[in-house]
Amino acid sequence: MRHLPADMVPYWDLQFSEGSSEPRDSSAAAAAVCGILEMCSNGGLEKEEQSFYRNEAQRMLESLIDKYAVTSSQEANGLLRHGVYAKSSPYNSVSDRGVDECNLWGDYFYLEALTRNMKEWKTYW
């Protein structure tokens, strides 16, 4: 959480922090919201910790809704803009593909996060 920028949506790599010009990864934020909410529902956290993490997940989800969600089918071919899945760095050999676009897992976790936010989630696993 310490590496997240003010809008709570991480850069494509958590080594970057506030003020970086690197692209954001909305799909990582959507997956993180689901993971945080799952962690909070499984026990093991003190009430204060659980409240903190639920609030952080809520802030992250609100940012996705307000700043990253597609608002028109004319705008994009998915639900959540600004996802990343292949970004080059000194530590890998990939080409920049899938930077700043919608992706399948971002859309899936975004829908799951919205569902978890609206009602008690009953896992199907």
Stretches with model-predicted labels:
Residues M1-W125:
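Glycan-recognition and catalytic cores of secretory/periplasmic carbohydrate-active enzymes
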